[in-house]
Structure formats: C-alpha cells, structure tokens
Regions:
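Acidic-basic catalytic patches of nuclease active cores, encompassing PD-(D/E)XK
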Residues: 1-31
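Short glycine/proline- and charge-enriched loop/turn segments
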Residues: 1-3, 58-61, 115-116
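Short acidic/glycine-enriched loop/turn segments that link adjacent beta-strands
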Residues: 35-38
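Mg2+/Mn2+-dependent nuclease catalytic core
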Residues: 59-79, 87-88
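Hydrophobic "anchor" residues on beta-strands that sit immediately upstream
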Residues: 27, 50, 95
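Domain-level recognition of nuclease-like catalytic cores that cleave nucleotide substrates
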Residues: 88-121
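Conserved catalytic cores of phosphodiester-cleaving nucleases, focusing on short active-site segments
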Residues: 21, 40-61, 78
C-alpha cells in the first residue's frame, strides 16, 4: 500500500475535526481558506463566534503532541487569513476566536481529540 501524501493526511485530519466540531453543534462555514500564502484549515460558527480552527494530527505522541506543531509562523498566517476572511464577508468587528484541534490517530484505534478554545490571540 502506498504511503499517504501530506495533503491526504491533512484532508483526513480535517474530515475528523469537522465531524468532531459538528457533533458539538457547530456549523462548518469553510475549509482550506487561502489568502495569499496564508491558510485556515476550518472556519466554523459555534453560536457565539466565528472560529478559525487549526488542525494537527499525529499517529502518536512519540515526538510530541500535535498542538506543539503549531508554530509562531503558522499563527501569523492564520491571523492574516482570518482578517481577510472577515473583511471579504463584511464581518469586521464580529466576535471571533482561534482554536486548535489536535488529533492522535493510532492505527486501528478511534481518534483522540484535544480541543483548545481561544488557543492564541
């Protein structure tokens, strides 16, 4: 069996995260929003705010928890893309926040989710 590409793994992680968020009653507004070179994995609404979600998945914690892979550069890019998303939809000033969904997906096991709300500002 061929090894999954980085993009395939990313899509799988985002599918899992979307299902997780929808199970909490959230509405998914957009996936993989790009502005210039900046990307937001998931844009959702949780009945209080627009939530920009960064998703990270690992097969184990051997090399650290998925959350540890959210770099300062990634945070800057999420801010940039989120500002563009809000501006394009004339939603400047609306409540918004930034969450991280970390997923541990061990082989032949159910995924383990770690959701940090308001993870960065």
């Amino acid at each position: 069996m061929a090894k999954k590409s980085h993009r395939e793994i990313g899509n799988e992680a985002e599918d899992l995260a979307c299902a997780y968020l929808e199970s909490k009653g959230w509405r998914i507004l957009e996936r993989n929003y790009f502005f210039e070179h900046a990307e937001v994995d998931i844009v959702a609404y949780d009945d209080k705010a627009i939530v920009f979600v960064e998703v990270k998945m690992r097969s184990s914690t051997k090399y650290g928890h998925p959350m540890e892979y959210v770099t300062e550069e990634k945070v800057k890019n999420v801010f940039k893309a989120s500002e563009a998303w809000m501006y394009e939809r004339k939603m400047d000033g609306s409540p918004m926040r930034f969450d991280i969904v970390g997923i541990i997906q061990k082989k032949n096991e159910a995924p383990e989710f770690n959701h940090i709300e308001d993870a960065f500002r």
